[in-house]
């Protein structure tokens, strides 16, 4: 059984963005956003009003924010990565 040396090749040349479907903003995504925007403008007058959410549900975003702030300022258990020169 032979093992072949396979190397990955990466193409790093910049390519122009076109309307061929590979760009981030396509005609389909723009049409979808316009459709959803129109629905948000048209539907509220026809739908019945919703009751207010329970008080505990209103505390959920506050609790999530407190948790995220705590995690942002807590020290990590990973050792710090130091960059060392390659010269011996």
UniProtKB/Swiss-Prot annotation:
The keyword ATP-binding does not apply. Signal peptide: none annotated. Keywords: Cytoplasm, Developmental protein, Endoplasmic reticulum, Membrane, Nucleus, Transmembrane, Transmembrane helix. InterPro entries: ARGOS/ARL/OSR1. Mostly expressed in flowers, and, to a lower extent, in leaves and cotyledons. Residues 25-76 are annotated as: Organ Size Related (OSR) domain. The chain crosses the membrane at residues 30-50, 53-73. Induction: Induced by ethylene but repressed by abscisic acid (ABA) and epi-brassinolide (epi-BL) treatments. It is found in: Membrane; Endoplasmic reticulum; Nucleus; Cytoplasm. GO terms for biological process: cellular response to abscisic acid stimulus; cellular response to brassinosteroid stimulus; cellular response to ethylene stimulus; positive regulation of organ growth; post-embryonic plant organ development; regulation of cell division; regulation of cell growth; regulation of ethylene-activated signaling pathway. GO terms for cellular component: endoplasmic reticulum; membrane; nucleus. It is a multi-pass membrane protein. Belongs to the plant organ size related (OSR) protein family. Together with ARGOS and ARL, regulates organ growth and final organ size. Promotes both cell expansion and proliferation-dependent organ growth, in an ANT-dependent manner. This is Protein ORGAN SIZE RELATED 1. It comes from Arabidopsis thaliana. The lineage of its organism: Eukaryota, Viridiplantae, Streptophyta, Embryophyta, Tracheophyta.
């Amino acid at each position: 059984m032979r093992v072949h040396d396979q190397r990955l090749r990466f193409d790093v040349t910049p390519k122009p963005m076109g309307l061929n479907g590979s760009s981030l903003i396509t005609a389909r995504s723009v049409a979808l956003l316009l459709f959803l925007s129109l629905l948000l403008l048209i539907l509220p007058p026809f739908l019945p009003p919703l009751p207010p959410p329970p008080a505990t549900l209103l505390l959920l975003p506050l609790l999530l924010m407190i948790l995220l702030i705590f995690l942002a300022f807590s020290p990590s258990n990973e050792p710090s990565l130091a960059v060392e020169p390659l010269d011996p």
